[in-house]
Amino acid sequence: MSSDAQEASDDRRKYEFRKVIEELRDFEGSGTQLVTIYIPEDRQVSDVVAHVTQEHSEASNIKSKQTRTAVQDALTSIKDRLRYYDTFPPENGMVIFSGAIDAGGGQTDMVTRTLESPPQPVESFRYHCDSAFLTEPLEHMLEDSGLFGLIVLDRREANVGWLKGKRVEPVKSASSLVPGKQRKGGQSAQRFARLRLEAIDNFYQEVAGMADDLFVDKRHELDGILVGGPSPTKDEFLDGDYLHHELQDKVLGKFDVAYTDESGLKDLVDNASEALADQEIVEDKRHMDEFFENLHTGEEATYGFDQTRRNLIMGSVDRLLISEDLRSDVVVYECPNGHEEYEVVDSRHSTPSHECSECGEEADVDEREDVIEHLMSIAEQRGTDTKFISTDFEKGEQLLDAFGGIAGILRYSTGV
């Protein structure tokens, strides 16, 4: 499998995992009756079955009949699932969720989900029984890779934060007491200059303290530190060895940034694109910049479900751009006269009625599926790459808000 094909496969699998995790996270049990089991790849299935059998036996001591029955039913369902596996679980292990969830009106529904081969290996065996499924370890596996420290400063203010994968996270800020260059009456120029230099030095120490508090404990996980601001501020700060000595070697570079508030952290990431060339957020921005450039020429760009789908079917889409935050379904309607039409609806909403635009007849629902999976299936058949775009930068937000979360960069202009 080529690297692009492998990346597309990994992205799709991550999306499918994320979708299931979001569903599981919303489930609640009426008591402590939702069971989660994390199984590493080197744990023998027979050992897990023995553990589940033991838990089933111990559950007979639960006083509440409802909870006792629910827990034992969940464990029985898990044992049934484990019968489908040989000696060991799949690569990277697996996670099984089972339990009676609250369906409202005093009713419950029994659900069992199995997630095989997560993006990262399951580190240890874990049995968990609570009123909610344990999804946090899986959520951590899906976090974007790459961890960078961010510092922006001038002589008025400073902000410190993280770049985690595609997300810029402001964490700490400070305002300086550095006086302006004009001295107050009665002060000698020499005394004023000395006081000003002391204030600058104190402020740099404060900024370094914020950075040290945030970054030192994470220094072994850090991929680098980026420093931004106007000259000579950022130069003085770095040349003055204010940062902790173990952080100084992590500095990837200094970059000119016009703003030093929270928005300056995003500007810093933009301006450090060469240093971050292999990071996902830079790739996202490159795709969106190309999309907007093509859109402004009126040629090799498409957006929205209908136009993008038509171009996908034609095989003209080079890259399908999907917002990571898109949560919609596509409903396929068919009228009595055989006309087929599509409508995109929020995944949380019920299926609306539909009148055929061609003949006016009431149309029946033929199918409803996740809009991303629908489009990705066509893309795979046509050799189109799919890119998931973060909303943690302006053009990524625009993809979701202005274009419905769906767009494409075309191989050639189609007029569609």
UniProtKB/Swiss-Prot annotation:
NCBIfam families in the record: aRF1_eRF1
Family: Belongs to the eukaryotic release factor 1 family.
Highest classification ranks of the organism: Archaea, Methanobacteriati, Methanobacteriota, Stenosarchaea group, Halobacteria
Alphabetized UniProt keyword annotations: Cytoplasm, Protein biosynthesis
Location(s) in or outside the cell: Cytoplasm
Role of this protein: Directs the termination of nascent peptide synthesis (translation) in response to the termination codons UAA, UAG and UGA.
UniProt xrefs under SUPFAM superfamilies: L30e-like (SSF55315), N-terminal domain of eukaryotic peptide chain release factor subunit 1, ERF1 (SSF55481), Translational machinery components (SSF53137)
InterPro entries named in the record: eFR1_2_sf, eRF1_1_Pelota, eRF1_1_sf, eRF1_2, eRF1_3, Peptide_chain-rel_aRF1, Peptide_chain-rel_eRF1/aRF1, Ribosomal_eL30-like_sf
GO cellular component: cytoplasm
Entry-linked Pfam families: eRF1_1 (PF03463), eRF1_2 (PF03464), eRF1_3 (PF03465)
Protein name stated in the entry: Peptide chain release factor subunit 1
Gene field: prf1
